[in-house]
A protein has these predicted regions:
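Long, charged, low-complexity intrinsically disordered regions
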Residues: 1-82
């Protein structure tokens, strides 16, 4: 995988399924990948959003997290644009 931003839809996934998906993306993300954009929705509760924040805020590959203004998307920044 080499695009700059990888987008994945986590709608309907459990936290376990989301973790498997995101961990696989983090393993496969190449050096040209800047962000992982994780779409989890804000209308079905905050379980996935909270899980992503708790689990990946201190992950060694993640520089920082960005939560969208509407709360439906979390972006994991793997490296900054230069």
């Amino acid at each position: 995988m080499s695009p700059g931003v990888i987008t994945v839809d986590l709608h309907g996934k459990t936290t376990y399924q989301a973790r498997i998906t995101v961990d696989a993306l983090l393993r496969r993300a190449g050096s040209s990948t800047y962000w992982l954009r994780l779409i989890h929705s804000c209308h079905a509760g905050t379980a996935l959003r909270d899980f992503l924040e708790r689990t990946y805020a201190r992950h060694p590959r993640v520089k920082r997290l960005i939560l969208s203004p509407d709360g439906g998307t979390t972006e994991l920044v793997l490296r900054e644009y230069v």
